[in-house]
Regions:
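Hydrophobic residues at beta-strand termini and immediately following loops
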Residues: 29, 78, 126
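Short, positively charged
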Residues: 86-124
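Hydrophobic/aromatic residues in well-formed alpha-helices
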Residues: 6-9, 90, 123, 128
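A short beta-sheet element
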Residues: 55-96
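A short glycine-rich beta-alpha junction/loop motif
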Residues: 69-74, 110-137
Length: 174
């Protein structure tokens, strides 16, 4: 396992200022696209990299449906060698990893701004531990599956609540 700075293994591309983009609205990468990619609504393919939402400090793999979209300045595209980094492992480390959380907290110390937006320099200076690619795949796939399972459980809880409310209304009407 090696520990490396992100800027040593990832090529970052900052999104464009929205006022300078001439693309159609449907060609822009939106926060909804980000959430859909993270929650596996769209299918992903290896080698497409990841997107970091700089406002939320979250990371998601790029899906086939959003790979050609133009990203705005609230997003950072991450391209890397798929033989070195597995996208879902990187997302797990960025979104849930204790090491990243501690490094980001240290960066935010002394910041008085209410919006603690990350920047490309700070992200590049974060360190990541890179185990062998097979271990990354195992961790990343488990992380992806946990997101899918959580979403299914939330949906099931919503359905149970709707059903219960329907029963209550029927009893109340009698």
């Amino acid at each position: 396992m090696e520990s490396v700075y992100l800027n040593e293994v990832i090529q970052f591309t900052l999104g464009k200022n929205p006022t300078r983009i001439r693309a159609q609205v449907d060609e822009l990468y939106t926060p909804e696209d980000f959430e859909n990619d993270l929650h596996c609504i769209h299918s992903t393919k290896e080698g497409m990299g990841c997107i970091i939402n700089l406002i939320k400090s979250k990371c998601s793999p790029i899906s086939e449906q959003t790979e050609a979209k133009c990203i705005t300045s609230n997003f950072l595209r991450c391209d890397f060698d798929i033989g070195k980094i597995y996208a879902w492992y990187f997302c797990y480390q960025f979104n849930e990893g204790k090491s990243f959380e501690q490094q980001i907290e240290m960066y935010h110390q002394g910041t008085t701004l209410s919006v603690k937006k990350l920047n490309i320099k700070t992200i590049g200076e974060l360190k990541i531990i890179l185990p062998d690619i097979q271990k990354q795949r195992t961790i990343g796939n488990l992380y992806r599956q946990s997101i899918i399972q959580n979403d299914l459980m939330v949906k099931q809880a919503e359905n149970v609540r709707k059903f219960t409310m329907t029963l209550i209304r029927r009893i109340d009407e009698d």
